[in-house]
Amino acid sequence: MKFEQPLQSATLLKRYKRFLADVVTANGEEFTLHCANTGAMTGCATPGDTVWYSTSSNVKRKYPHSWELTQTQSGDWICINTLRANTIIADAIEAGDIPELSDYDEIRREVKYGSENSRIDILLKSNHKVDCYIEVKSVTLLDAGMGYFPDAKTERGQKHLRELTAIAKSGLRAILFYAVPHTGITQVSVAKEIDPKYDLLLKQACDAGVEILCYRINISEYDLTIGKQLPFISKG
């Protein structure tokens, strides 16, 4: 996925109210960015980090600039715009770059499903195999090379696990896809200390047949592409 226009850089001053961040450019201009990330963003929003942002052509937007990437002071690159992951994964599936999700005839996005009024991120359909429901999550919480999800308690994430579990029990294919847009993460696990209920529901989902896939997202200020598969580490 190429960015529509080259990203521009600034230095992060602070993130606040979840959806806003103040930055300063090299020439001293200060302004506010929109932040499309509801998570805690632990380690992704340290004052002094380099922020890469896009600019919308929509003149009606109150905050025309959107925070896309963080370049940390330790050298890691992180895509903090969680809206990007679904597009990257869908594009990679269509291009045949994810072997586990190949040989489907049709890909749909944001399809209503389940008993809790949910929308599945990606639905794959085929004339010769069962439907495949894919829920995409972005992993950006880093600790000593391990990426953890979630980075904050997530009732929405819990709901998605219940929905995927029901899909798997019905005989259809259900996949929890951890996209890893963080160059410092080499493997993925669940953050059970942060959200014990999510950890329990994930175990139940796996027991029901829900599959887990983890793939790195390659990051630059020009584009985002699918990278190599990463291991998921279960911690009992």
Curated annotation (Swiss-Prot):
InterPro entries: SfsA (IPR005224), SfsA_C (IPR040452), SfsA_N (IPR041465). PANTHER family: SUGAR FERMENTATION STIMULATION PROTEIN A. It holds the Pfam family SfsA. It comes from Proteus mirabilis (strain HI4320). Belongs to the SfsA family. The gene is sfsA. It comes from the Bacteria. This is Sugar fermentation stimulation protein homolog. GO terms for molecular function: DNA binding.
